[in-house]
Amino acid sequence: MTQESINQPIVVAALYKFVTLSDYVAFREPLLQAMVDNGIKGTLLIADEGINGTVSGSREGIDGLMAWLKSDPRLIDIDHKESYCDEQPFYRTKVKLKKEIVTLGVEGVDPNKSVGTYVEPKDWNDLITDPEVLLIDTRNDYEVSIGTFEGAIDPKTTSFREFPEYIKAHFDPAVHKKVAMFCTGGIRCEKASSYMLGEGFEEVYHLKGGILKYLEEVPEQESQWRGECFVFDNRVTVRHDLTEGDYDQCHACRTPISAEDRASEHYAPGVSCPHCWDSLSEKTRRSAIDRQKQIELAKARNQPHPIGRNYRLPSEA
C-alpha cells in the first residue's frame, strides 16, 4: 500500500473496453449488483460495443469489482487507471444501457474491428515531437482550456459528435500522413482512431491509457503535458501527480472555473460564473439559487447532497 493510498483512502478507477457484449441488456443487473456488493459509487455505461465508466470505492471494493469483471472472459484484460481522493467523488451507483459507450454518432465505426496503433506513455514524447506528426486533442473545448500536450491542435468542439465534421473540414489523408490523438482515459481517441482509419488516414496513433496513464507513468520533469487534466467527477481536475487540482466547476454551465473566475463579481457559488452569468434565464437562475440553498443546508448537516453536481461521462459530454 502506498502512502498516497493511506492518506487518500478512496480509489477512483476509470475503466473501459471495446468488446462485443451482445447480451449487454441482461448484463446490466448482475453488473449493478456487483457494484452494490462491493460498495462502489459511480456510473458504468454498457452497449453492444463494450463498457465504459468511472467508479470509486475502497481498495477492497475496487479490487472486488475488477475481479468480478475479469471473471468474464470477454473482460479479462479490461483497461483501468487509478487515482486517489479523501472523499467519495460520486453520490450514486448506476449502470446505463447505451447505443455507444462513447458517442461519435457515425454508423459503421467499430473499434472491435479496426483501431490505430497504441502508443505506450513512455514512447509518447518521441512520437509527438516528430515534426511530421499531426497531434490532435480529441476532447471538448472546456477540457482543452485547462491543459493539453505541447503543440496539440484544439478542434474547439463542444461534443465528441462534432469531431468527424472537424476532421473532414480541416484534414486530408493524402496530405496528413501521420496523426496522433489523445484523450482523458483513452476511449475517445481509440474510437477516433477507428473513424480516421475508415476515412483513409494511413498512420493513426493514440495514447494508450490516455492522459491519466501518461501523468501516472511519465515523470513531471520529462513531461510534455501543460496544465491540469479535467476529470468527470467531483475533483474537476487533477495535477500531474494525479492529486486534486485547483479548479472548481460551475453548476450552471459546467465550465471549469479557476481561482480568478471565483474572484469575479459575476461568480455566485452554485449559481453562475463569468462564463455564463449573462446567458442564464431567470428560471434557470432561480432554480440554481434554490439548489445551492439545499446544498448548503446538507453541508451544515454533514450530509451528502446528490444534486450537488451533475457530472457526465465523456461519452455523454
Curated annotation (Swiss-Prot):
Keyword Oxidoreductase on entry: yes
Signal peptide: none
Annotated active site: 183 (cysteine persulfide intermediate)
UniProt-annotated stretches for the region Disordered: 298-317
Keyword set, alphabetical order: Oxidoreductase, tRNA processing
Residue ranges occupied by any Rhodanese domain in the UniProt entry: 129-223
Origin: domain of life: Bacteria
Reactions this protein catalyses: uridine(34) in tRNA + AH2 + O2 = 5-hydroxyuridine(34) in tRNA + A + H2O
Catalytic class of the enzyme: oxidoreductase
EC number: 1.14.-.-
Protein family (similarity comment): Belongs to the TrhO family.
HAMAP family recorded: TrhO
Protein name: tRNA uridine(34) hydroxylase
Species: Pseudomonas syringae pv. tomato (strain ATCC BAA-871 / DC3000)
